[in-house]
Amino acid sequence: MERVSGRLEKTVKIGYQDVTIERDTTTFQKQTDAYGEYEHRKNTITIQNGLQPLDEANTLLHEILHGVAYINSLTQSGQPLDKEDREEVVINTMTNGLSQVFRDNQWLLPYFKDKFK
């Protein structure tokens, strides 16, 4: 795996963790294969190399939301996302919804950036 370079940073802060962003040169052939993965034990997000920009952004957001869910204990036993399939449905739904909101409202991310100073 090579480190992400270019427009993406090498790390993203999620809660108290600095999570490393890496690229994976694996090419996924099946429709059910993932484009990325969040590994809490390694503190990494891995993204498939060569994705289209929209897919790459959606994948990064998806994996960040997995990190948010894990770091905030939503995946612990007895919590709302304690089952892997439930977690995946919720994360995927929220990711796709937010991606659409950000894409349809180009002013929104700069607005948040200004307000979150």
Whereabouts are the PLM-identified features?
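Metalloprotease/metallohydrolase-associated module, dominated by Zn2+-dependent proteases
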Residues: 1-55, 71-117
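Active-site recognition of the HExxH zinc-binding catalytic motif
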Residues: 58-70
